[in-house]
């Protein structure tokens, strides 16, 4: 029994990863945003749309512990910017309904300028 318990503890220690930093968790989101921005500058709007969608998806799946560390303005502000960028890419692709839906999500995030 002692060997089994030691084996379980050892296996847990080997597979457990250290807690990721806030920046490490946000890095994939930032990468998508940057790729989306570069694609927009290069007029590759379909690629930009994919990247902005992925950034939003990744941000919305962050652990609650990370999202609660963000104050309301930063959380809403971050998503607001990505929804706005997504709407811009969609409008360039002549996806009017999708662009309007993205703008509605932008407004729903609050703190609109």
Language-model regions, residue ranges each:
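Flexible helix-coil transition and linker loops at the boundaries of alpha-helical arrays
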Residues: 21-23, 59-76
């Amino acid at each position: 029994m002692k060997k089994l318990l030691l084996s379980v503890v050892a296996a847990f220690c080997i597979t457990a990863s250290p807690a990721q930093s806030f920046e490490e968790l946000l890095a994939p989101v930032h990468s998508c945003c940057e790729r989306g921005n570069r694609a927009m500058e290069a007029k590759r709007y379909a690629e930009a749309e994919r990247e902005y969608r992925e950034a939003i998806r990744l941000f919305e799946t962050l652990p609650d512990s990370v999202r609660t560390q963000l104050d309301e303005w930063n959380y809403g502000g971050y998503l607001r910017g990505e929804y706005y960028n997504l709407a811009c890419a969609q409008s360039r692709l002549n996806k009017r309904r999708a662009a309007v839906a993205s703008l509605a999500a932008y407004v729903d995030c609050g703190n609109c300028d």
